[in-house]
Amino acid sequence: MTDSLGTWRARTIVATMFPLLVALSILEMGSGYVLEALEATYLDNPTLLILVPVMIGMGGNLGAILSSRLSTRLHLGTLEFSPRDEQLWASVAAIMLLAATVFGALGVAAWVLGRVVAEPMALADLLIISVGSGMVLAVLAVVLSVAATYVSYRQGLDPDDTTIPVVTNVCDILG
């Protein structure tokens, strides 16, 4: 494949993104089947219906934030794919702290809304589900962001075009 870093031609972007987006769309359909299979669980615990969609979106958002930062650093020439890259670790720490804060707040918000619209789950249970699964999703988003940026770079693709769709779609599936 030709090196698309530094090029902004529509043809190059479409040629890169079209097959990727088709594959990711097919994978997204699979996640819909998983959600459908869990329908009974969600109907038994309506508060989860409040929690799950937001968690799915938030995992992708966290991955998109890190992917954007990594892509910018790559274009500026300051990104090192090294375990000693202090800026990379600072970005990862920021994402993890943001995840803990957001998923904790999400658990409380789901509990409050659950009290209004349905029979709520216990706050402790919601916090364990929200923060626990949210942090696992955040770790996966971090790993996916770094891997997608690295693979894009090694393949000569512009990570601005590839990383965010890959990370957000995979986080949607894993969420």
Regions found by a protein language model. Give the residues of each.
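Single, functionally critical "micro-switch" positions that shape active/binding sites
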Residues: 59, 155-157, 171
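Helix-loop-helix hairpins and the membrane-proximal interhelical loops
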Residues: 1-40, 111-128
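Short alpha-helical transmembrane segments in multi-pass integral membrane proteins
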Residues: 94-113, 123
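Juxtamembrane helix-loop transition segments at the membrane interface in multi-pass membrane proteins
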Residues: 65-83, 144-164
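Hydrophobic alpha-helical transmembrane segments that form the multi-pass transporter/flippase core
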Residues: 25, 126-146, 159-175
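Alpha-helical membrane-inserting segments
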Residues: 26-35, 39, 105-113, 117, ...
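Juxtamembrane loop-helix boundary motifs flanking transmembrane segments in multi-pass membrane proteins
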Residues: 2-10, 46, 50, 80-92, ...
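Hydrophobic, small-residue-rich transmembrane alpha-helices and their short perimembrane loops
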Residues: 13-101, 134, 169
